[in-house]
Amino acid sequence: YALWIIMGEALARKYKATGDKRYYVDPHVAMLGIDALGFRRGAGALATLLQENGLADHPLFAEAKIRGIRALAGHAESTDVTNDVNGGPSGIGIATAAGKAAFWDMVGASMEGPKVIAFEGEFAMTEGHAQELKTQALALQVGKRLRVMFSDNNAGIDDSLLGGVIASKYDHYSLVDQWTSYGWNVFTLDDGNDYDQVVAALKTMEDWDPKDRRPMVVVGKTVKGYWPCVSHGKISGQCDHVVGYPSHPYAMKMNSEYFVALAKTFEEQYGVEFVGIRQGAVTDTRERLIQFKANIDVAMSVLERNGLGDWLVERLVAIGDTVKDDAKLHFDVKHDPFQDDRLRVANLPVEPQKVTVKNRISGVEKQVSIALFRKPGEIAGTRRGISEIIKWMNYVTDSRFITLAADLSESINVEHGSLWGHYDPENNPLGTRIKAAIQEAGNVSTAIGLVSQSASVDPEKFAGVWALSGTYGAFTPLMYTPARVWSQQNQDSKFRMGVLHILAGHSGPETAADGRTHFGIFATQVWKLFPRGQTIHLNFWDYNDVAAGYFAAAEIAARDPKVGIISIEVARPDFPVADRAKFADTDLKAAAKGFYVIRDFAPGQPKHGYIVTQGSSSTVNLVSILPRLEQAGINVKVVAAISEELFDHQSEAYRNSVLPPEARYDLMVVSTGTRRMWPLRDVGPLTDAYSLTSDWDNQWLTGGLEPEVIAEAHLDKESVLKGIERFANDRTTRLNHQKSLLSAL
């Protein structure tokens, strides 16, 4: 933040003094001295901070009248204009670096630029997703485009790494050897605080042979708590220099002896004097703000001395003049193919297609078969539809949909979504299937890196790729933290970015013989733990739901920048494709509406309630027993729940026609998921008591063959029949119980 404030202030002062537009930076983009007040403060509090303390018209704070005070997150975020990632969870930003670099290879940018430079330290690199970067970057062969500046200061917050977490006797724990063993191009610096050594390393990397596809890392020995004016371990000749993890500033008090000693060296170096720091801590908020801003101005006044500010702005302008936006890339950067009308649900072909695709690099043509929908009775589970929607997406977008799966590409049916095979930056840059290790966190981080880039010079338009990372549903929580931080970045981004996809393949108890470690019952619920409307979660039960439901979500996400994630849940088994002519809603593309009616109430007969069904085996078995329910005189309305988010996008009239508000109090759920989280919100107080879910007895399932596991989950046909019979027979009791609860208020 300090660096960006210094640069912003230098330019602002020069523009004010000269009026020369070469020095102008939009204050809504620049960081200014006033923004130091925003460090670790929220935007809401900053909006009224000065007014509440009687400082709104104080001359020290006049800069705030330009555009307020910028909130500077405690861990740097992309909104700060300092980073292309959101920081916070250790290593979360650098984990995306391989994907960012690979994007520019995919779009055909020269190896001379853009380049991706990542900064990280040794403690953060012990984090799992950060460690996985080592494999990710080499697998993607990003070469010199990715340059990691690795600060080895052997200091965290609570301890040292070597000699602390790792005992000193294990002297073979070598950070340099770790990077080398992963195949990286490794450089070392004896003193990472020496600018000459750092610049020499940067120059070496810049001049390196672009044909060398090893990613680069510079490991420099640094000092946490480094200060340039130290003599014999003392600051200002009086205080011991505090280094290592004890120097973490959180515990330092305002205007403490050590702080004053540090400030004194700055005063002596630049001939300035800070205000009030030798009178101890300031307890009055108003006076503390005044002292703080006054001393920020003292520091910034150095820009007016000895031509320092003039040198800095001329250097910044010269650098800015070298930035070009006319790089030759493989595709049109002014057109967003994800908004192509062929991707709209209404325009999806219902018959199998045989399309001709042309490799824009090699010129080779070939034909590709795509079946977005299948005939009733054909045997095909929902996972079979995944490769087809990816193929259609790549056909329409000219191979702009990238997939990474944790050594499961064939198994979870993303393998054949690539029209041109596996990606290789040199031999097959148009391949969209990235070969990936079993690194769920690393894979999703790479996918995030890919979708976070855009070649468009218009911040309102997107010119990039979409990406999907997939694994067993049970393992997808490993992807959650990177995806959560990505969602936060996407929410506030000043630039239109791509859409991250999470594929929870082999979800539900249907994973069966793999054992309960692989059941995606509870695990997949994490994909609902986002602000409403910022993700779209899809849970498919029938093959013909997949294309309609997915492209409805894609149609929204391509046009609403708030939607940064689409998560998809499918199960392993192959079932006969449903005959929708027998449904109340016969629309082949009904899944696009989120919820749709499988069976409506029979007219002229007593109603027994609403059933919301979700998941493959649960819904297939429920649909199969509908004739038996009718024979028994049970009159229920059955609603398939594909996506609550898609349902929310429908008109109120449609929503009420499917599930009127009162239905929540006369409703049960049949789901392969969990009773801890329902397919829709605001269900009634007795929903839990009558619903059928995989955790019906609040126990982990065991395992076995698929029919055995489904029976244990009480989602087999007979269990579903008995559960619905109980629900229907108890209707009067259910409703009376709820009435009594209300009357007791």
Predicted regions, residues:
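Thiamine diphosphate
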Residues: 1-117, 294-575, 640-645, 651, ...
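Active-site glycine-centered loops adjacent to acidic/histidine catalytic or metal-binding residues
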Residues: 122
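Active-site-adjacent loop/helix micro-motif of nuclease/hydrolase catalytic cores
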Residues: 125-129, 476-479
